[in-house]
Amino acid sequence: LDNRPKTLELASKLLINPLRSSDAARKRYVFSDGKLNLLPESPVSFLTSDLLSLYGRLRVMYEFFAPRGRADDETLADFARRRLGKEAYEKLIDPMASGIYAGNPESMSLKSCFPKVFNLEDKYGSLIKGMIKLQREAKKSGKRKVGAGPGGTLTSFHDGMGMMIDSLKGYLKERLRSGSKVVSVERKNKGYAVHLSDGMVVETEILVIASPAYSASEILKNLDRPLSSVLSEIPYPSVSVVCFGYRKERIADKLDGFGFLIPYKERRKILGSLWDSSIFPGRAPDGYVL
């Protein structure tokens, strides 16, 4: 997403141009009741959409009047059912959360995973009330429209996200050391000693660990055992990404959209599908789709 100026500044410094997603990427689908349903993009399209039943749509509108929650935190599932109703949770919130985290909304902390949503209820007492007030404030100040989500436009690069990594490697040159596994970290003087698998020790005053929690847990055992223990308890869902390429004429649908997500209640074996060649140009050879 292009809502982080520092990322765009880095791309500019590396002399690589961001590639914005196509207009088709705005169309997103949910597989429900045996068919693909277009996600509503506006309040009007939501009212006329058949993704939710009439009762389900009315229940979402009742959110405006629903009482404020009393708990300091709750799961995303509990929050969604309480404020939006069971049907909206199952068909909208569940697949949305799975698409972002690939996890179970029944165990996701609302405050940690969706702080903007938590703050809307906490500050305004209602998601709808909060959105209306934020939109009015944004209009007065001349800002772009705001939302409860991260906002921004989906952005990549001509040769994919790997282009930024390759450009960073070229920019850093000998200052970058790759292919060496970090075995452990320990305190040394006023800084840290980083032990690598090839026997080399790197000493530094500042250390940033940008790895999965389970890897950081192993690295930090000798430095901070309590922190290592906490990191080891953070759950990670097991996810596989499978890429399929087809000749365009073999696909009946024109794949005009971002892709689709599947609610857990549908009991399918996949979380969803992204239509990469529809999102960004150059992701598949001519005559093919990815």
Regions found by a protein language model. Name each.
Residues 1-4, 70, 158, 267:
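Short, solvent-exposed loop/helix junctions and linker helices
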Residues 1-68:
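Dinucleotide-binding Rossmann-like beta1-alpha1 core, especially the glycine-rich loop
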Residues 4, 11, 93, 220-224:
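Short, flexible helix/strand-to-coil boundary loops that buttress conserved ligand/catalytic motifs
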Residues 5-6, 95, 214:
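Alpha-helix/helix-capping structural signal
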Residues 7-8, 165, 270:
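A general structural signal for well-ordered alpha-helical segments in protein cores
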Residues 18-20, 86-93, 228-232:
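Short, surface-exposed acidic
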Residues 59-185:
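Active-site/ligand-binding neighborhood in enzyme catalytic cores
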Residues 178-289:
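Mid-domain catalytic core of redox enzymes
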